[in-house]
């Protein structure tokens, strides 16, 4: 993988999302501007880190970053817009929530939302760009905590384990118990569980 070449500017925000694939809950995004004077060791793609390491980095990022912000799109917005457009909206919200306006925004993936400043999509950015890695960690820890809370409210589904992704266990529980109000009704397995799918 080629080393990423940063844009010639100072205030660079990294943006990433977590939760495009799950059948339940919001898609959560984060935007982070790191402080060059306060480097954070060990930033890497959140999916490659242990949960313990993610939690430690979560606190360190919030403490050391120049600024950070979370964004989200709720299940009803995902159902209305589709998952791609809802993700773009959540990314826009994360960037808009930053207390410092970035001069440039780096987005994980291959597509950028419409933003009021220059931006660039970076494929595999969560493992190539520190700001995107930091955003990935903030988004994942936040969404995982939301799934743990949802698990307490709906203990039959196993949300704390599968985080809402369409695992065999989740699909089985969906058949047994039906969908919660937090499920994404536009997603095929949820439609089928609700009897809304057109065969």
Swiss-Prot record:
Cofactor note: Manganese or magnesium. Binds 1 divalent metal ion per monomer in the absence of substrate. May bind a second metal ion after substrate binding.
RNase H type-2 domain location: 10-199
Residues engaged in binding a divalent metal cation: 16-17, 108
This enzyme's EC code(s): 3.1.26.4
GO cellular component: cytoplasm; ribonuclease H2 complex
Location of this chain's protein in the cell: Cytoplasm
Regions crossing the membrane: none
Xref: InterPro entries: RNase_HII, RNase_HII/HIII, RNase_HII/HIII_dom, RNaseH-like_sf, RNaseH_sf
Signal peptide location: none
GO biological process: DNA replication, removal of RNA primer; mismatch repair
A GO term for molecular function: manganese ion binding
Cofactor annotation: Mn(2+); Mg(2+)
Family: Belongs to the RNase HII family.
Name used for this protein in its record: Ribonuclease HII
Taxonomic source organism: Klebsiella pneumoniae subsp. pneumoniae (strain ATCC 700721 / MGH 78578)
């Amino acid at each position: 993988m080629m080393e990423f070449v940063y844009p010639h500017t100072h205030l660079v925000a990294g943006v990433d999302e977590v939760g495009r694939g799950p059948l339940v809950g919001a898609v959560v995004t984060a935007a982070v501007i790191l402080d060059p004077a306060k480097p954070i060791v060990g930033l890497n793609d959140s999916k490659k880190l242990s949960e313990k390491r993610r939690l430690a980095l979560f606190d360190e990022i919030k403490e050391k970053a120049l600024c950070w912000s979370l964004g989200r799109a709720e299940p009803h917005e995902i159902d209305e817009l589709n998952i791609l457009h809802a993700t773009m909206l959540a990314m826009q919200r994360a960037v808009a929530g930053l207390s410092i306006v970035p001069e440039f925004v780096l987005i994980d993936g291959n597509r950028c939302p419409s933003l009021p400043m220059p931006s660039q999509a970076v494929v595999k950015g969560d493992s190539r760009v520190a700001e995107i890695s930091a955003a990935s960690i903030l988004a994942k820890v936040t969404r995982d905590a939301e799934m743990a809370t949802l698990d307490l409210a709906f203990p039959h589904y196993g949300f704390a384990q599968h985080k809402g992704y369409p695992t065999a266990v989740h699909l089985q529980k969906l058949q047994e118990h039906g969908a919660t109000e937090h499920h994404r009704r536009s997603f095929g397995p949820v439609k089928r569980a609700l009897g809304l799918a057109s065969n």
